């Protein structure tokens, strides 16, 4: 278990919901991954991300799914790809990742409360 953080620290993490518009295999990645283009609504716009989620997802199955992503981390260069947000998920006992998705449709750009 990690150290406690303050409410103020938690509020600094900007987690928003967005809809995956496009997904493709990240062929250049060292570990199997999928590149995604995600719509976070008018205010935030479109952002790109990469995630190692191939154990449970293929690119075609991701299009149209809403995901929760951290949008205020610095951009990160991953090989030839620039990731602009961090798609969130839950690590399973085997190390695979299950995406964090809203149970019901949410407005793109809505902030996690």
Please describe what each predicted stretch is.
Residues 1-113:
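Phosphate-backbone binding interfaces of nucleic-acid-interacting proteins
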């Amino acid at each position: 278990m990690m150290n406690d953080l303050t409410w103020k620290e938690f509020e600094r993490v900007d987690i928003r919901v967005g809809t995956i518009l496009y997904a493709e295999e990240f062929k250049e990645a060292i570990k199997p991954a999928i590149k995604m283009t995600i719509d976070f609504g008018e205010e935030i716009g479109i952002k790109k991300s990469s995630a190692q989620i191939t154990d449970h997802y293929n690119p075609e199955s991701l299009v149209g799914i809403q995901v929760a992503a951290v949008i205020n981390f610095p951009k990160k260069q991953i090989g030839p790809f620039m990731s602009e947000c961090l798609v969130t998920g839950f690590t399973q006992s085997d190390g695979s990742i299950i995406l964090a998705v809203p149970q019901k449709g949410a407005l793109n750009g809505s902030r996690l409360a």
